[in-house]
Amino acid sequence: MGKDTIADLLTSIRNADMNKKGTVRVVSTNITENIVKILLREGFIESVRKHQERNRYFLVSTLRHQKRKTRKGIYRTRTFLKRISRPGLRIYTNYQGIPKVLGGMGIAILSTSRGIMTDREARLNRIGGEVLCYIW
């Protein structure tokens, strides 16, 4: 685990999703708690609980695995997560320049002056901020 807790969170979720794991355990910080709450609200995660070991808190998230049925059979959908603004290169945007991820099917998570929120909420409130990640 490095200093970039957002990248650690996204990588843990991505790896657990690729390996078909049911749960993910990440270190609990204010920013990771807010991002996980957004993922829970948007339906990418089924449940979240806070777990304490010694003096450290962890978030244990249960992933949602969706299965789709086609003519060729059943296949499992994957959750794609991409870190945009990172410690070496910060990406900021105003509310007019907030990108629509996958034509509005995905979400962008922004850190604004009013807290961490999705791209839709930021457009409604007409505020910009730092683009943290894309999820689709």
Swiss-Prot record:
Keywords, ordered alphabetically: Chloroplast, Plastid, Ribonucleoprotein, Ribosomal protein, RNA-binding, rRNA-binding
Keyword Ribonucleoprotein: yes
Gene3D superfamilies in UniProt: 3.30.1370.30, 3.30.1490.10
GO biological process: translation
Localization per Swiss-Prot or TrEMBL: Plastid, Chloroplast
UniProt main location, coarse: plastid
One of the record's GO cellular component terms: ribonucleoprotein complex
A Pfam family the protein falls into: Ribosomal_S8
InterPro entries listed in its UniProt record: Ribosomal_uS8, Ribosomal_uS8_CS, Ribosomal_uS8_sf
One Gene Ontology term of the molecular function aspect: rRNA binding
Subunit structure: Part of the 30S ribosomal subunit.
Similarity field: Belongs to the universal ribosomal protein uS8 family.
NCBIfam families: PRK00136.1
Role, per record: One of the primary rRNA binding proteins, it binds directly to 16S rRNA central domain where it helps coordinate assembly of the platform of the 30S subunit.
PANTHER family: 40S RIBOSOMAL PROTEIN S15A (PTHR11758)
Protein name from the UniProt record: Small ribosomal subunit protein uS8c
Organism: Triticum aestivum (Wheat)
Gene it is expressed from: rps8
